[in-house]
Amino acid sequence: MEKFQGYSEFDGARQQSFLYPLFFREYIYVLAYDHGLNRLNRNRSIFLENADYDKKYSSLIVKRLILRMYEQNRLIIPTKDLNQNHFLGHISLFYYQMISVLFAVIVEIPFSLRLGSSFEGKQFKKSYNLQSIHSIFPFLEDKFSHFNYVLDVVIPYPIHLEILVQILRYRVKDASSLHFFRFCLYEYCNCKNFYIKKKSILNPRFFLFLYNSHVCEYESIFFFLRKRSSHLRSISYKVLFERILFYGKIQHFFKVFVNNFPAILGLLKDPFIHYVRYHGRSILATKDTPLLMNKWKYYFVNLWQCYFSVWFQSQKVNINQLSKDNLEFLGYLSSLRLNPLVVRSQMLENAFLIHNVRIKLDSIIPMSSIIGSLAKDKFCNVLGHPISKAIWTDSSDSDILNRFVRICRNISHYYSGSSQKKNLYRIKYILRLCCVKTLARKHKSTVRAFLKRLGSGLLEEFLTGEDQVLSLIFPRSYYASKRLYRVRIWYLDILYLNDLVNHE
């Protein structure tokens, strides 16, 4: 980013908050191309000339696109021409895909500069443990025992393109860029309706930015109203406040009214509320009564329908009681389990029993989802019976064994915090037997004959690595006992979900 800040055009555009001139600068296309090569999934960038050609940047394609943008009439193709000239439609769709890639890069520039300036002069201590996914579960163990309800809200998608344009208008002040974005978005969808394919080249970065902008707008309003929820008692709203003047009206919040929002919001101040967004869902955990949870549900329905103009059904908001229902979160099924505890107390000559109930977070492995993921990747059938991995039989024995051991260790580490180890052992059994069947199929032998020839030492690789790690953590006496296999262990070095865990 520092490399391109030296250009005078970029500095002038940054000072005036103008992004539109950047669409006509070739170095921005180089930046987008370079980012496309460095993506994690290593997909082919659309700035390449073709799939078979060496990965070189095509300046000719960029020059043609810039010339077309200088004459925007050449970018407009009537529907009649799309039906008559298919080649023309494919070319236009290709150009609009290029613009979407470029727009995703350009529109993130002011956000990155604003974020970098906010961190200037500040020192932050890096804590790598907090980056781990497993660091969330100890927090849940401490906090969820005090909660009783979870509100699970499915975030709806905007049904009209103009909603996305209006949301982006609050964050990008350049009118020319917004008009150009609206024009390209409509033309792109027009061409896509005629020529889109199931496996066509899309730009996930661009659509992810639009989706995050849509969700960020929703969350900013929700968080503000959440902090001011004590002021919302018995207030009926009439006029929708403009988002552009949103921050200016904070001090005059009592005068703000909402259009077509006649509901009386009696939301109470609750300091024990926690919010998280996961897999397109908003999860709200709190210690409220059923009446207040229904009010929150009614609030979400009206917020989406009245403010975002999205038809939102109340069935998409589920109120789950943690003591009865399971919460699917980060590959686990979490719920609250009541453990009765009896304590015998004796005072002088009198003895009596004290019955206590201990609330504990119960984390369970979703076996149906894991078996479905294993069956999808051909490790077993839909019933969970192991089968051979035929596609791996061309590899060497050591390569096949290392693949299965790596998958087994990753799943074992991720689900080491499960309160029911029996399901984890079943997953290990499926992978081990699948490994043996794959090796037996490669050597054209039966499983029994293959194990009889090589012995049981073949499967020791599945246990060696995990045993070494646990022996360093726990004392030898505790490690030798069977209690180790009943405790939950959270690893603080897991930074991403495994593909089998992230089955959605």
UniProtKB/Swiss-Prot annotation:
Superkingdom of source: Eukaryota
Pfam families, from UniProt? Intron_maturas2, MatK_N
Alphabetized, the UniProt keywords read:
Chloroplast, mRNA processing, Plastid, RNA-binding, tRNA processing
Instruction: Tell me, in one coarse class, where this protein mainly resides.
Output: plastid
Q: Where in the cell is it found?
A: Plastid, Chloroplast
Q: Which GO terms describe its molecular function?
A: RNA binding
Which Gene Ontology biological process is one annotated for this entry?
tRNA processing
Provide one Gene Ontology cellular component: chloroplast
Q: Which PANTHER family match?
A: MATURASE K
Q: What does this protein do?
A: Usually encoded in the trnK tRNA gene intron. Probably assists in splicing its own and other chloroplast group II introns.
Q: Which family does it belong to?
A: Belongs to the intron maturase 2 family. MatK subfamily.
Q: Which HAMAP family match?
A: MatK
This protein is called: Maturase K
Q: Which organism is it from?
A: Nasturtium officinale
